[in-house]
């Protein structure tokens, strides 16, 4: 999606998460993302909100489809692997966070072993952004103010 103007940061959600090939229980993983959006947008107008994601198969594209179905504007920011090589992921992650979202949502079944999702979460925390993390065998943590062993 091409954007003609910068969205209001108080209405921006950044999503990061696990790659599709690594998700063990797709049905429950998708349900977790749906539940997040339903809770976050309860009694709000979804069309006023923008989702920014990193265009990765898995959590990013699941969240993008769910957000689109709910009526949010969806913006994908892909990593430029050809231009930046291995640095492309972290560069893309920082670009997403520079929109200063009101929340960064991370969906991962094992975030401590993650590279990309963990990089986004740690960078967001360093930027003093609100981060919501959900992963298997741990309740959603709400707003994180420390890296919780990430």
Roles of regions detected by a PLM:
Residues 2-144:
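Acidic/glycine-enriched connector segments
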